């Protein structure tokens, strides 16, 4: 199997001052192309360290994606490191220099002399175009390893990988068939509880069951070779059966996006009133393009479940909304949820059984509970659901 590695560069990445989203994206993207990463390394802006690791990985990896260090400043060292590792000099790529000058001219700017550095590549390098920025990429062969050098700006990096690097890999190597990866996301059951229920399932050869906990959800993944796809699809039915009503969506689209699509297809507008969640619901649904009619964040106040149910019913009527959803204030470890619909208003009062979680985590969990309440109503399910340390202590329905 082709041994593919990634090298992230930059002091800000090494020291945790920024999150390396490029590495996460590349690992996921390459995995679904049949090119799982076998190793990831991070090195700061130090020429000796960069040269050392390039020479080291050139003895082990077939392909190395180097990210970052192609800018115009003194701490951008990737091109010089590549040239030094190969024992050659840098040469000016005249065509890219002209392209950069055109790039700045079209934007009414004068190119700084420091940008000239971005057109200096190792003498043996293969030029790689960057259609969306000033940092071109390049490729060099060092010992057994084909190395691709890419810009750190995420939008530029992704375009280069998808449109320049992946086609080159397909030309030069015989790539394996992408693996099959089936995913679903659950809410309300713990990772250990799900694992205990699923451990008895017999997995086909080469197939693995994975769990990823990210408060407040658990993702289940069934991954295996394409040759086992039929057996995996059959097993997936058992996985969904065992997970039961804790399943909130399949795939990677996300619950807000699926709710948004369902609301649009059924021509339901939605109004929101949030206290404890502080606008988190509105943010998630608006980003997903949900048909939101009105949203408000109001100060927390102590109220009974009946009060929450009645005022969200009135709010739906006043706004002529298809649906209205409310999350009340948090008082004495209790919280109210209410959903006003054409079929009536459904309300739940829940109790937190622990105080060990932060405010942010509690808000995330409650936002997901509210979304799940909406999802369950849209799917003609009982709206009540619990989540480990959150217990439903009261429910009520107001008829139309």
Curated annotation (Swiss-Prot):
**Classification via InterPro entries:** CinA (IPR050101), CinA-like_C (IPR036653), Competence-induced_CinA (IPR008135), MoaB/Mog-like_dom_sf (IPR036425), MoaB/Mog_dom (IPR001453)
Q: Which Gene3D superfamilies match?
A: MoaB/Mog-like domain (3.40.980.10)
Q: Which domain of life is it from?
A: Bacteria
Family in the record? Belongs to the CinA family.
NCBIfam families according to UniProt: cinA_nterm, molyb_syn, PRK03673.1
What protein name does the entry list? CinA-like protein
Species name: Escherichia coli (strain SMS-3-5 / SECEC)
């Amino acid at each position: 199997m082709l041994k593919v590695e990634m090298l992230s560069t930059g002091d800000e990445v090494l020291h945790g001052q920024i999150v390396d989203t490029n590495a996460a994206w590349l690992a996921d993207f390459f995995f679904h192309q049949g090119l799982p990463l076998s190793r990831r390394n991070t090195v700061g802006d130090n020429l000796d360290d960069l040269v050392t690791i390039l020479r080291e990985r050139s003895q082990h990896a077939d392909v190395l994606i180097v990210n970052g260090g192609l800018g115009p400043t003194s701490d951008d060292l990737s091109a010089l490191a590549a040239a030094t590792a190969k024992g050659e000099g840098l040469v000016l790529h005249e065509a890219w220099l002209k392209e950069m000058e055109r790039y700045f001219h079209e934007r009414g700017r004068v190119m700084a002399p420091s940008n000239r550095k971005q057109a200096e590549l190792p003498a043996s390098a293969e030029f790689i175009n960057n259609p969306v920025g000033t940092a071109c990429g390049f490729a060099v062969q060092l010992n057994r390893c084909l190395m691709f050098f890419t810009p750190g700006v995420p939008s530029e990096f992704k375009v280069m990988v998808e449109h320049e690097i992946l086609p080159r890999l397909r030309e030069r190597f015989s790539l394996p068939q992408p693996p099959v990866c089936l995913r679903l996301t659950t809410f309300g059951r713990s990772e250990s509880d799900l694992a205990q229920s699923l451990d008895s399932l017999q997995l086909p050869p080469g197939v693995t069951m994975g769990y990823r906990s990210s408060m407040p959800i658990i993702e289940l993944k069934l991954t295996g070779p394409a040759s086992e796809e039929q057996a995996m699809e059959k097993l997936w039915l058992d996985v969904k059966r065992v997970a039961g009503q804790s399943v909130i969506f399949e795939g990677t689209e996300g619950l807000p996006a699926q709710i948004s699509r369902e609301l649009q297809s059924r021509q339901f507008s939605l109004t929101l009133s949030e206290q404890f969640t502080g606008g988190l619901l509105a943010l998630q649904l608006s980003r997903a393009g949900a048909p939101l009619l009105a949203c408000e964040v109001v100060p927390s106040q102590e109220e009974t479940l009946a009060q929450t149910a009645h005022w969200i019913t009135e709010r739906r009527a006043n706004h002529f909304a298809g649906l209205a959803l409310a999350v009340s204030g948090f008082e004495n470890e209790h919280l109210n949820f209410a959903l006003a619909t054409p079929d009536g208003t459904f309300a739940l009062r829940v109790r937190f059984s622990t105080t060990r979680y932060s405010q942010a985590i509690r808000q995330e969990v409650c936002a997901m509970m509210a979304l799940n309440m909406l999802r369950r109503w849209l799917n003609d399910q009982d709206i009540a659901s619990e989540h480990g340390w959150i217990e439903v202590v009261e429910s009520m329905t107001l008829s139309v």
